[in-house]
Amino acid sequence: MPRGPMGGRRAVEEPHDFGKVMGKLVNYCRNYLPVIIIALILGAAGTVCQIVGPDKLKDMTNEIVKGLPAIVNGRPVMNSVDFGTVGHIAWTLVALYVGYAVLGYVQSWMMANVTQRTAQRLRESISVKINKLPLKYFDKVSYGDVLSRITNDVDAIGQTLGQSLGSLITSVTLFVGALVMMFYNNVIMTLCAIGASLIGLIIMMAIMKSSQKYFARQQMALGDVNGHVEEMYAGHLIVKAYNGEADSIRRFEKYNSDLYESGWKSQFLSGLMMPLMNFVGNFGYVVVCVVGAALALDGQIEFGVIVAFMMYIRLFTQPLSQFAQAFQNLQRCAAAAERVFGFLEEPEMEDESDKSALLGTNGHEVKGDVEFSHVQFGYEPGKPIIHDFSASVSAGQKVAIVGPTGAGKTTMVNLLMRFYEISGGSISIDGVDTKSVPRWNVHDQFSMVLQDTWVFRGTVRENIAYSKPGVTNKQIEDACKAVGLDHFIRSLPDGYDTVLDDKSSLSQGQKQLLTIARAMVQDAPILILDEATSSVDTRTEELIQKAMDALTVGRTSFVIAHRLSTIRDADMILVMNHGDVIERGTHDELLAAGGFYADLYNSQFALAD
């Protein structure tokens, strides 16, 4: 029973440490490293095929030029061309480029497989992590932000990691290989090409440095937008009831504006890379042609070298743009990975694998004796809200906890079920300290009907028998009859096999009845009713109350309700205020005492009486 999705917002994070985050990601992918290495080797091998191609084209060009010693009647004489050699070179070129295409395809397939498996593992890790986080984490982080990490951030990793790594390796290989081949063919032309490209490289590095912070801000702003939209959608009735549309729109516009500001800046700077590299490449073509022509006229190089250099200058500048794009994608990947790993590294609940399940084991059923002894608790250190709570509840008793908002009623039930850990004192069930057994063993002893109803996508049967194996159809139907829901369910198109979800056209009262039927089917020794009838009409409340009276027989039950009419028959009423029990007793005893409870009761029923 956490305090809700608007319990807090995540603080603005500092720009991430790129190397540290990528190191974590590599470590997370360590099981796939052999496949990644093979894929990168294949990509590098394909790039080598691409690099060798222009050199072979140079040889082919030179062979053809050698066969053109003179021009006769304005036409080239082709008799001296060695077509055998030219054909052999041509087939070699075909083999090289086919090899380049095949190796590139295999590399892309392998990297796509690895990155999607990594994304799958990340989602699974997040899903497991959610169940290990204490509820206090969700008091300070919006649900929308967590959803953003599961969807947007993991998708960003899956989309960018494989492409970025592959492009990075092939770009480096292509850059180095083209540089080596250019020096091999002609040093002067190579130095001219490097000089033409150096300008673009300097500008590229400056842009990458500037854009990194905007990618991190973009991911942060996206989480804020998702969090706000999720909260407003979940609470849209409250927003309308309180005329909060203007405030909601104002907040959304602020978050959306932040996303726009960081988004356009990161995309604009990233988008500068391609036109910049195209300019550098075209400028390099001009330099190569001019210098190459001068050297050819001087007899220092063959014509084929110019042809090869025109291709090599493209292969030399292309990696610069690819490298820039790959690094930009890695920055986006790192920004998303930092948020995902930040979530995965959040402190978890204490590992309890070494604790024995002492409740309801070895054939000994839990009776339901509950003891609170000097319990203390606070959501924040140094800010206690439960100061010194003590109470003894015998098995089968119906205990009502009442008090004003913020008195600590729901908090006490949260502590009883170990949703939160107490700061002092102890809570025991049948004499067993709840901290000495695993949480799941404590949870098994409770059935719950919460203030906020919950229906998941599935049939009516599946909803009622949630997480309870072995439930028979008769048990489900009997529970629905007990709460007066059977007739309505049978009127549905498929009866108990009708598929429901959270958007199903069930009234709030019907959802409440369904959750009560679910609690009946669980058949746990202790029952928790948190505002169980606060969302239904008087007639439905009466039906529910009768069903609850039958359900609570022989079971320990804790009822939290503002409607005091539902707790008149309670065996014990605990009146709380400011985290302390200020009164306790039966309904008649508390009325006779004329204290806080009597004032509260009289304020509700004076007119009715």
Positions of predicted regions on the chain:
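Short intracellular "coupling" helices and adjacent cytoplasmic loop segments at the cytosolic face
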Residues: 3-13, 116, 124-148, 152-154, ...
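Juxtamembrane loop-to-helix connectors within ABC transporter transmembrane domains
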Residues: 20-21, 29, 111-112, 131-175, ...
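Alpha-helical segments in transporter systems
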Residues: 23-26, 34-59, 93, 108-112, ...
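An intracellular "coupling" helix at the cytosolic face of ABC transporter transmembrane type-1 domains
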Residues: 31, 135-136, 152-161, 165, ...
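Transmembrane helices of ABC transporter permease
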Residues: 31, 35-48, 163-217, 288-301, ...
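Transmembrane helix-loop-helix hairpins at lipid-water interfaces of multipass membrane proteins
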Residues: 36-103, 183-188, 299-303
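Helix-loop-helix
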Residues: 181-195, 265-338, 343-344
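ABC-type nucleotide-binding domain
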Residues: 358-609
